[in-house]
């Protein structure tokens, strides 16, 4: 558990460097669409395409890299969840898209702000109960498919957000619910980042000495 917390601090610290730049404000590229509002109300993955079309942030933006990817991944694995687990996932997806609807409807937005709003929505919605299930009950009764949903690629995408509170919720609280496989992937990837940061620091140090 201590290793996971250490990785949280490292990932959040590395990610915070990017905030020195900030992101420019993006003006809406298309009008608010009633069909997109309906998609948000239904937890439909199409909502993330709507969000990206209105406020384009590219392949590395939240709507495409996180929102759409994880929504589509959940749909792909839908048949493998328990009947109650399917209801839980539907409720969780709808909570996130509904929470992000005001962002979609806003007159302008920064990509960083969309990312923060998305991460906060994912974390906040994870505390709710859906179909009478808590997140811990959901994880324990759908462990195999949950571990599939959080593969190495998915863990890497979440780490890219650098949102320590969301990462804590998924990987620390998740481990307490028995999701140790996903937490081990997080720790392993975090170790790789630590090694990369160490190599970078050594390179800078050598460059400085040779000046």
Model-derived segments and their meaning:
Residues 15-208:
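Mature extracellular/luminal domains of secreted and GPI-anchored eukaryotic proteins, especially small
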Residues 1-16:
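Cleavable N-terminal signal peptides of Sec/SRP-targeted secreted and luminal proteins
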């Amino acid at each position: 558990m201590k290793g996971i917390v250490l990785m949280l601090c490292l990932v959040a610290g590395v990610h915070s460097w990017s905030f020195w730049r900030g992101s420019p404000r993006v003006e809406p590229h298309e009008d608010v669409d009633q069909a997109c509002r309906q998609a948000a109300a239904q937890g439909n993955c199409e909502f993330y395409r709507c969000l990206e079309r209105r406020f384009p942030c590219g392949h590395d933006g939240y709507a495409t890299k996180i929102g759409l990817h994880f929504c589509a991944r959940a749909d792909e694995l839908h048949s493998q969840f328990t009947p109650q687990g399917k209801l839980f996932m539907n409720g969780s997806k709808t909570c996130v898209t509904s929470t992000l609807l005001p962002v979609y409807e806003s007159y302008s937005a920064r990509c960083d702000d969309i990312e923060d709003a998305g991460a906060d929505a994912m974390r906040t919605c994870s505390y709710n109960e859906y179909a009478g299930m808590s997140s811990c009950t959901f994880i324990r009764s759908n462990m195999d498919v949950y571990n599939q949903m959080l593969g190495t690629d998915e863990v890497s995408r979440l780490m890219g957000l650098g949102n320590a509170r969301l990462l804590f919720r998924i990987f620390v609280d998740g481990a307490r619910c028995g999701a140790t496989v996903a937490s081990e992937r997080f720790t392993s990837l975090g170790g790789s980042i630590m090694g990369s940061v160490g190599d970078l620091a050594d390179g800078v140090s050598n460059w400085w000495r040779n000046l």
